[in-house]
From Swiss-Prot:
It comes from Homo sapiens (Human). The modification Phosphothreonine is found at residue 294. This is Folliculin-interacting protein 1. One of its GO terms (molecular function) is enzyme binding. It comes from the Eukaryota. Coiled coil: none annotated. Binding partner of the GTPase-activating protein FLCN: involved in the cellular response to amino acid availability by regulating the non-canonical mTORC1 signaling cascade controlling the MiT/TFE factors TFEB and TFE3. Required to promote FLCN recruitment to lysosomes and interaction with Rag GTPases, leading to activation of the non-canonical mTORC1 signaling. GO terms for cellular component: cytoplasm; cytosol; lysosomal membrane. Residues 781-817, 912-956 are annotated as: Disordered. Transmembrane segments: none annotated. Residues 783-805, 915-925 have a biased composition (Basic and acidic residues). The keyword Ubl conjugation applies. Pfam families: FNIP_C, FNIP_M, FNIP_N.
Amino acid sequence: MAPTLFQKLFSKRTGLGAPGRDARDPDCGFSWPLPEFDPSQIRLIVYQDCERRGRNVLFDSSVKRRNEDISVSKLGSDAQVKVFGKCCQLKPGGDSSSSLDSSVTSSSDIKDQCLKYQGSRCSSDANMLGEMMFGSVAMSYKGSTLKIHQIRSPPQLMLSKVFTARTGSSICGSLNTLQDSLEFINQDNNTLKADNNTVINGLLGNIGLSQFCSPRRAFSEQGPLRLIRSASFFAVHSNPMDMPGRELNEDRDSGIARSASLSSLLITPFPSPNSSLTRSCASSYQRRWRRSQTTSLENGVFPRWSIEESFNLSDESCGPNPGIVRKKKIAIGVIFSLSKDEDENNKFNEFFFSHFPLFESHMNKLKSAIEQAMKMSRRSADASQRSLAYNRIVDALNEFRTTICNLYTMPRIGEPVWLTMMSGTPEKNHLCYRFMKEFTFLMENASKNQFLPALITAVLTNHLAWVPTVMPNGQPPIKIFLEKHSSQSVDMLAKTHPYNPLWAQLGDLYGAIGSPVRLARTVVVGKRQDMVQRLLYFLTYFIRCSELQETHLLENGEDEAIVMPGTVITTTLEKGEIEESEYVLVTMHRNKSSLLFKESEEIRTPNCNCKYCSHPLLGQNVENISQQEREDIQNSSKELLGISDECQMISPSDCQEENAVDVKQYRDKLRTCFDAKLETVVCTGSVPVDKCALSESGLESTEETWQSEKLLDSDSHTGKAMRSTGMVVEKKPPDKIVPASFSCEAAQTKVTFLIGDSMSPDSDTELRSQAVVDQITRHHTKPLKEERGAIDQHQETKQTTKDQSGESDTQNMVSEEPCELPCWNHSDPESMSLFDEYFNDDSIETRTIDDVPFKTSTDSKDHCCMLEFSKILCTKNNKQNNEFCKCIETVPQDSCKTCFPQQDQRDTLSILVPHGDKESSDKKIAVGTEWDIPRNESSDSALGDSESEDTGHDMTRQVSSYYGGEQEDWAEEDEIPFPGSKLIEVSAVQPNIANFGRSLLGGYCSSYVPDFVLQGIGSDERFRQCLMSDLSHAVQHPVLDEPIAEAVCIIADMDKWTVQVASSQRRVTDNKLGKEVLVSSLVSNLLHSTLQLYKHNLSPNFCVMHLEDRLQELYFKSKMLSEYLRGQMRVHVKELGVVLGIESSDLPLLAAVASTHSPYVAQILL
C-alpha cells in the first residue's frame, strides 16, 4: 500500500530530510542533502486518438533516430527525441508501422538543404502506455482527465493528461479550439456544454489505499506483461454528490484545483466523488448521473461511437462547416523513470505526491506549449514549420525537465526560524540568540541604501501570513485567512474532503490571504554566498506559514502497541473506588521503560546498592527491609523529594561525589524500585535545589508548590525531547491536568503499569512538538507506579514524587539510612485519590511555573554526580519548620544536591496535597517567569509561552487573576476527541521535505527555481529571462485553489543594494525588473528599536518579543485604518496623516495588512 501524504517522507537519514546537526553550527541552516535526479529520467510521450485513423504516437522522447549525430534542438544532449508527427500508427494487433509523411528531422547532408522525413520504430511500451492513458476514457467523454500511474517493473511513475481537440475541414476550425471542456462552465452558449467534472479528486485519494479501475481494455498481448498499478479513477465512476464548482475562465483544468483540498486526495479512506456542481445549472446532477450510467464500466463497454450518446458534437460549431467537425483526443504522458533503489524511489514518490500541485502546474505549462506546436504544425504544410513545431516541443520538454529537477534537488534552508520556533525546539533560547546575531550583522552590514528596511517592508507587504500570527486572542478571526485554511464552500465539500493543512500552508507561504489575492515570492541575488545565506535565514522569520504535524487515528479495538512501536501492555488489579469489586486496568508503556525491571548487573553491587552513590536499590532488596525501618519511613520527619523526567534518586546528606563521566555512562540503566502516588503535577524547569522555596502555610493548606530551576549554563541535548536552556511553560487550567488514580491494593496484586492517558493533541503548539527527537509519545501523560515487593498495605501511605512525562524511564534510589519519606494517613477521609479530588467541588488547583517563585543561580560546585533528567533534593541535619503537609513537620532548608541533570529539560513535579479549606489558596507564592513581560497573547505566536534566561523580571501574579483572564480561552481551545478513537501524532525525528514550509524555502541555488517562495541565486541572467513568463504562468495556472489576481516577485539585489517588486501586471521597462520599494517608516523604526534593545544587552528572547509586539502594532494600525475607511469612497493621503498619523510611506503596507481582514480597503486605496 502506497504511503499517504503525511507519512514520513524518508525512512533513512540520507534522504531529503534535514539531518541531525548541531544547531550552534552557523551554517547548519543551509545544509540539506541533495538527492540525485537526472533530467534524462523524465520522458515525454504524446498520443492522438482520432475517430477515423485510430491511435498514433506524435512524440516520444525516448526513441532515438537513426542519425545519432543530428541534433534538432540547441538546448542539450538529451534532445535526441522522436520526431513530431504521426510516425507510429498503433494497430489493434500491437504491431506498429511507420508513417513517413509526417515525421521530420534535419538532414546531415549539406547538399540537400530541404528537410528530410525519416521513420523510426515505436518504442516497445507504446501500446501499453497508450492503453493506460486512454484506457477507460470513452471518446464520448469530452472532458480533460488527469491520471497518475505507478509501473512497478521497471519502476516508473507516469502523469498523464487526456484532453479533447476538435478539428474540421477549415483551417480556422482545426485546432484553434484546443481547450478542455472543463473550461466551458456554461459561460458561452457556443462552446461545449459538457459537464464540469474532475478526475484527480478521487484518483489521488485512492493511491496507496487500493488498486482501482484497471484500464478498460486489456493490455496488448504482444508486448511484455507488466505489473501496473493505475491510480486512475474517473468521473464516470462517481455517484452524484454535492460538490461545488469554481469560476474558471482560463485553462485551469486542474482536478486538484477544483477539489480545493489536496490532503483529501491523499488521505481519503474511500473514493472521493469527483463531480463538480455547475453553478448555473441545477440539472447537472441528472446529466452526470445519466452519463455515469451510460459510460461506467460496471454497465459494460459501449461502442466508441453511438448516435444515442448525448455528448456528440453535432450541435456545436467551431467553424463554417460544423457538420464535418471531427474530434481528436490528445494524450500527454510524462514518465519519471525511477532508480532501482527502493529507498530512492520512495523519496521521489513522497516528494511527487506531496508537491503534486506544483507538478500539475508545470504539466499544464507543457500542455500549452504542445498545443501551440500542434496548431503551428497543422496551419502549414511546410516542413520547416513542422520542424519548428517539433523544436518547440523539445524546448518545452527541456524546460519542464530542468524545472522539475531543480525543484527536487536544489538546497533548502534546513532550519527556518519561524517554523523551528513553532516546532517547539529545545534550543529556543539559542535560536533567538542566533536570530538576533544575524539581525545585528545585517543591520550593520546590509543597511546601505536602506536595503534591509526596504526588503522587510516588501516582505511584510506581500507575504501576509504573519498577520494572523500576531493577532491577539479574542480578536474576530480573519475571514479570508480562514477561507484560505479551509476549502471553498466548506459545508458541502466537508462531505468528502477534510480540512486541508497542506493547502493552507502553501497559501501561507505565498502570502495569498489578502484581497485581492496576490501570490508572492522572494529572490535574493548576490555573488557573496555567505551574505545571501545569512539574509535568507533572517527572512525565514518573516515569511511564515503553519507547521504541519502528522497524526494517525486509532479506531476502537485497534491495538495501540501496533501503532506505537516498542510499547508494552501491562495490567494491574485495582480495587474499585466506589464498589468493593476489583477491576483490571490495562495500560501501555515503552518497551525500554524501567517498568520492565531489567536492571543491568553493571549498576548494581552484590548487595543491591547503587553503583553511583552506594545506596541500596529498594526494589532489589525490599524484602530485607525490616519492619522497624518501615516504621521509620512512616514516622520520619525528613522528606526526600526527587524531581525527575527519567531518573529519580533519594540520597543521604552525606552522599559521596562521583565521576560525572562514569555516571553518564550508566545513567540510562537505573530503574525505579518503590511505589509512589501522584498527587499534583506542576510543570517545572530546574534551579539549584538549595534555592528552592517552600511556602509556609498551615497544616490544612490546600496546595503547596515546590519548584526547582536548574542551572542555566547547562548544555542542550538534541537527543531528548525537552528544552535545554529554559523551562517549558505549559498553560493549562486545573481541569486540563490529567488525573491519576492510585491503587489501594497490596503490592502483591500489582503489576507495573502507567496511569493517565491523554492522547488528544495538546493545544500548546510548543509542547505538542517537543517529543520529536526521541520519538516519545507526547500525548501520553503517564505517572508511574512501581512494585514494592512484600511491603504491607499501609506502606501505601508514603508519598514521593513521581515523574509524569512522555517518557516512561524513571529511576529511583533510596538512601542507606532508613528511607525518610513523608507519611499520609490513609485513614484520613481527606486522603483520597487525586481522581476523587479532581471531581470534587474543592478540587486541587495546579499552577504552572508562571506562578511559582524561584531564584536562578550559577553555582554548581556541590553537585555530587550527574544523572540526565534528574534533580534531587536530599535532607541534611539542619532543619527548619516548613510545614508542607499534615504529616510533614520539618523540611530541610539547606539541601544538598546529590544528582543534577546534565541539561535543562522539562520536568514535572508531583506533590502530595490533602484536601482542606480554600483559604490557603490565596497564600500561594506567585512567580513571574523571565517571560512574564506584558506583551501580546497571540495564540499563533511561537514565543508566547517561551522563556528567557537573563531578562531578570520577577513579577508576581495572583492565581485568581492568572487563571481568571484566560479561563475562557482555555474553554475555547478544548479539543474533544472522537468517541472511541484517539489521535496518535507521528513524530518525525527530523523535518522532512514533504511539507511546503520546509521544501519551498530554498537556500543558495545555482539557478533560479520558479516554485521556491524564497531563494538565493548568484546571477540574474536566466532569472531575468524567465521571470515575467513565470509570473504570467503563476496567474494562468495557479497552484492554489482559487484564481490569482496578481503574482509578484520581490527582487533583493545584494550587489546593487536595491529592492524591487516585479508584478505580472507590469511590464519590464528601462531594463528594470520591477518597481522600487518605498521604505515604510514603521518598519524602519521597528528594526532600529529592536537593534537598540539588543545593543543595550537585553536578552535575545526579549528582543524577539519586542519585535513581535511591534508587528502587532502594524496589525492594530491597519485595523484603525480599516475602521476609518469604512463607508468612504475616496480618502486623501494627507487626511490619513492628519487624522490617523499614518505617513504616506506606511500606507501600502497598512493597506495590504488591512486587506486581510477588511477587503474593502483595497478597493479604496489600492
